[in-house]
Regions:
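Short, surface-exposed secondary-structure edge patches
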Residues: 97-100
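Short, well-ordered loop/turn sites that connect or cap secondary structure elements
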Residues: 102-105
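Conserved small-residue
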Residues: 26-94, 113-115, 124-131, 137-155
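Sequence context surrounding c-type heme c attachment/ligation sites in exported
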Residues: 20-29, 117-353
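Sec-dependent signal peptide recognition
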Residues: 2-9
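C-terminal motif of bacterial Sec signal peptides marking the signal peptidase cleavage site
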Residues: 15-18
Length: 353
């Protein structure tokens, strides 16, 4: 259980170009001239979300830069995430584990990029994804960046882009997949209708480097109604080895897998239920649960205590074959750190409890 801070500190406005968790907060909410019924635009620049060079992603007034506690793995791409709402609009708290209730007119923005791209050791933006909340529901808009990094253009058909970069001290390469509209819906759906994934209080309820709680900052700038409970169950940063191992794996599965392995989602026919709110019961994670699909007779359970070689989930997370990998979409590489976390958790278990 994580507790919301009830004392607000001095609110510092930072307009920065880095990706640290305590920027960028701009407390001016401005319509920006966006007519929601005209969207999506043909180019990203038409929205006026950013000031200066668009590739620098410095948000304009009314665009809030947020961070989840744990992030979805997408072939090691980095992300910048933003929220824009029409003037006077606010989101509402529903529950710890449910999406914030965003008003019509909300636009969610997510940019995917790499640093240290070869051969020139530069930053390269791959794509910017929008989810636009209209009266008819949420709509997708996918923008692919041009070679000069001067703008991104609407393209809902999907494509691949080869890229190589330095990850720490290692050279990595990916045939990076930019999703089609159909692929967006596979992950972003509930009962067949498009929905966002990460903007739940459980994912936002943590202190930024400034010491301010992120949910309280949303309230302070006028983007969230001040109706939060005093306690909110929250995920942790799964990369933090100082956090509880169970909490780390549950947080990892929630952000990487639960969008498909939940009721009325794409893989709801499978026995796993991987939302953070459900994995306090390890059976929902697949511990000592037989898989519904036999790939290899040795894989006797989804998760087998103390034995990664008999655990279906470990096999799927370690695979890059599109017929067997997990997640189904969003990666072509193995998330080595995620697999290591799963191995550590499996090896810590001695029985089915």
């Amino acid at each position: 259980m994580r507790y919301l801070k009830i004392t607000l500190g001095i609110f510092i406005l930072l307009i920065m170009n880095s990706c640290v968790k305590d920027k960028i907060i701009i407390p001016v909410i401005d319509d920006g001239g966006i007519n929601i019924n005209e969207l999506p635009y043909a180019s990203l620049s038409e929205y006026d979300f950013f000031i200066g060079e668009i590739k620098l992603q410095n948000p304009t007034a009314g665009v809030f830069n947020y961070q989840p506690a744990s992030s979805l793995f997408t072939d090691y791409a980095k992300k910048k995430r933003f929220i824009w709402m029409p003037e006077g609009s606010k989101a509402n708290f529903v529950s710890d584990h449910e999406l914030l209730d965003f008003p019509v007119g909300t636009i969610l923005v997510k940019t995917f990029y790499y640093d240290h791209v070869l051969p020139s050791d530069e930053t390269r933006i791959m794509e910017t994804r929008l989810m636009i909340h209209k009266s008819s529901g949420w709509e997708f808009a996918e923008y692919v960046w041009n070679e000069d990094q001067t703008d991104a253009f609407l393209d809902m058909d999907g494509s691949y882009q080869e890229i190589s970069w330095i990850q720490d001290t290692e050279t990595k390469s990916s045939n990076y997949r930019i999703p089609s509209e159909t692929e967006c819906l596979i992950c972003h759906k509930k009962s067949g209708e498009p929905i966002p994934i990460g903007l739940k209080p459980q994912n936002l309820n943590f202190d930024l480097q400034s010491g301010q709680n992120q949910l309280l900052e949303l309230i302070q700038i006028g983007y969230l109604t001040d109706n939060l409970p005093s306690e909110i169950n929250a995920v942790v940063d799964y990369n933090n080895p100082n956090e509880n191992l169970d909490m780390r794996l549950r947080s990892y599965l929630d952000i990487n897998c639960a969008h498909c392995h939940s009721e009325n989602a794409h893989c709801d026919y499978r026995p796993m239920r991987l939302a953070f709110s459900e994995t306090n019961n390890p059976v929902n994670m697949g511990l000592c649960v037989e898989p519904d699909e036999i790939i290899d007779a040795a894989l006797i359970n989804i998760l087998t205590p103390g034995n990664i070689n008999r655990s279906m989930m470990h096999f799927r997370l370690s695979s890059t074959d599109e017929n067997t990998r997990m997640p189904l979409l969003g990666r072509t590489l193995v998330h080595e750190e995620g697999v290591q976390l799963l191995e550590e958790w499996i090896n810590s278990k001695t029985d089915c409890n």
